[in-house]
Amino acid sequence: MSQTLTVAAAQFASHIGDPDANFEEHHAWVAEARAAEADVLVFPELSLAGHYGAERLLDITMKRNDPRLLALSRAAGETILVVGFIEEGPAAQFYNAAGVYKGGRCIYLHRKINLPSYGKLIETKHYAQGRFVDTHAIGEDWRLGLLICADLWNPALTHLSFLHGATLLVSPISSGVEAVGEGFDNPAGWAATMHFYSMMYGAPSVMVNRVGPEQDLTFWGG
């Protein structure tokens, strides 16, 4: 991988609780990114589940090495994928997770740590809390720091990612305009947050949100 990194963002409307339809959508984005010779393709938070996919949690959860995920990675060739899904972990624990895939295997997995339980967000009802922040080398010049949505609203987690050597901050999110409540501008808040981190740490950041309506939320990605 060259010093210049080409990162693509797949911002689309996931199907709630329908992994088959979402995998089909993912394969279409992968084909487009591969044709464009993108080095990295980032999908939104919970891209294979939908924002409210946890309502069908037991039907749609998957392990990090699910054959469908590995097949998606193989279809991407040399393009690195960051994919969001509900992970089935040990001891009947389920996580809001994002996996990094290359060459048909999972090379890194992040489990969301800062689970929101305010406004219209009730993630603590469904998911176990992640515990670790780390980074992963994706080339000679690049080290990927991966945090999911509300993780970025805890500055300590972002700082820890850069202490671990991140040179690129990747942030899949699932952010609806109405998620927090009236009086808070979610898109503007995210823009300020990502600009701040890039300025403070001198590193590029990539935020990827979904689009379209889902139940009582309107997503503003794209």
Locations of regions flagged by a protein language model:
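Amphipathic beta-strand/beta-sheet edge segments enriched in Tyr/Trp
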Residues: 93-112, 216-222
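CN hydrolase (nitrilase-like) catalytic-core segments centered on the catalytic cysteine
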Residues: 64-83, 153-222
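A short, polar/charged loop-to-alpha-helix boundary motif
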Residues: 112-126
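A short, N-terminal amphipathic alpha-helix
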Residues: 25-40, 66-78
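Active-site glycine- and acidic-residue-rich loops that bind
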Residues: 88-92, 144-155, 182-187
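Short beta-strand scaffold segments in enzyme catalytic cores
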Residues: 83-85, 96-100, 134, 208, ...
